[in-house]
């Protein structure tokens, strides 16, 4: 391109000289959508405009070329690029779209990504390179070959930690997304691994649209309650006399303390069920709470307790190990 053919690339793209790479990229995308030949069949003016904005973007999107353009103005190509043919965008890549076969692309987005990939891939004479950004949700292919590109549009994910009480009752959380604060309502009954979708709070696209934010919920482990499906499981200690004679005891539940009858003669590890005291399920109602009884001997029995146990031992009529004594000679 001769010095007399100097073009103001900033004016062509409609950006200021201080525009960031992201702003230049966004503006090019906007103009490319408007003047693309497929959207303006037979319109020579639109075709020429498309070539012009593509030429401007090729220079301004390349930090090295942009620096020379800003420094040397109309003579920027003579600053170390005199051997490059006029109108060329690198080895094997030009901007003459006359007779270009756009039918090889599935849609216009695919063409734009390819075009930008060629402009920003060293020696890219048609090799397709894409920058993929995915945080677990659906991926989004950004402009190809941008090593320092901004995160592309699409869905994004974040992990949100909840206490068991918050997950049980539901809670509102204020989240800092960097560019804004949002309030998210977590419904009652959330579980570990549940996902909450927040519409329109994902990554912004060059079209001005935004993807969605997906929150992966993690529940802080609880010292007393564990999950079995929609049921809550807990272990509760009982004394030997309560196991033998039965008892009426207090049990912690998500709703508070409730009374539960322990039948006489229960075994250690046996579970009793509290109906409707488990985890809330919006579709099936609440699960149950399973109370696993653990018979616990006193660590420091009083003199009276020891005397009572000694009397019981002396009067015991059953051998609790009798059922397994038959296995004693199994390997003899």
From Swiss-Prot:
Superkingdom to which the source organism belongs: Bacteria
SMART domains from the UniProt entry: DnaJ (SM00271)
PANTHER family documented for this protein: DNAJ HOMOLOG 1, MITOCHONDRIAL-RELATED
Keywords assigned by UniProt, alphabetized: Chaperone
The name this protein goes by in its record: DnAJ-like protein slr0093
A Pfam family that the UniProt record links to this protein: DnaJ_C
GO CC terms: cytosol
J domain boundaries: 6-75
GO biological process: chaperone cofactor-dependent protein refolding
InterPro entries (UniProt xref): DnaJ_C (IPR002939), DnaJ_domain (IPR001623), DnaJ_domain_CS (IPR018253), HSP40/DnaJ_pept-bd (IPR008971), J_dom_sf (IPR036869)
GO MF, any single term: unfolded protein binding
């Amino acid at each position: 391109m001769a010095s007399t053919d100097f073009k103001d690339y900033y004016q062509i793209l409609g950006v200021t000289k201080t525009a960031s790479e992201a702003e230049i990229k966004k503006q090019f995308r906007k103009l490319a959508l408007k003047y693309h030949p497929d959207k303006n069949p037979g319109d020579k003016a639109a075709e020429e405009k498309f070539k012009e904005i593509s030429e401007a973007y090729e220079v301004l999107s390349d930090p090295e070329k942009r620096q020379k353009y800003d420094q040397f103005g109309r003579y920027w190509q003579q600053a170390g690029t005199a051997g490059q043919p006029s109108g060329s965008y690198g080895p094997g890549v030009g901007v003459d779209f006359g007779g270009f076969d756009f039918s090889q692309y599935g849609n216009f987005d695919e063409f734009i990504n390819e075009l930008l990939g060629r402009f920003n891939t060293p020696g890219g004479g048609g090799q397709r390179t894409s920058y993929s950004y995915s945080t677990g949700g659906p991926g989004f292919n950004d402009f190809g070959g941008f090593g320092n590109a901004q995160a592309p549009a699409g869905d994004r994910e974040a992990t949100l930690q909840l206490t068991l009480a918050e997950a049980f009752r539901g809670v509102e959380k204020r989240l800092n997304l960097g560019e804004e604060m949002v309030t998210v309502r977590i419904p009652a009954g959330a579980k570990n691994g549940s996902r909450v979708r927040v519409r329109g709070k994902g990554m912004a696209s060059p079209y001005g649209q935004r993807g969605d934010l997906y929150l992966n919920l993690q529940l802080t482990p609880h010292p007393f309650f564990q999950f079995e499906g929609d049921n809550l499981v807990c272990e509760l200690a009982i004394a030997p006399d309560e196991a033998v004679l039965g008892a009426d005891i207090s049990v912690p539940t998500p709703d508070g303390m409730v009374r539960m009858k322990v039948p006489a003669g229960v075994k250690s590890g046996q579970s009793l069920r509290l109906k409707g005291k488990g985890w809330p399920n919006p579709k099936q109602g609440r699960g149950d709470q399973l109370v696993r009884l653990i018979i616990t001997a006193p660590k420091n029995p009083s003199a009276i307790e020891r005397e009572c146990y000694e009397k019981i031992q002396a009067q015991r009529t059953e051998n609790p190990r009798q059922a397994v004594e038959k296995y004693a000679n199994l390997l003899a």
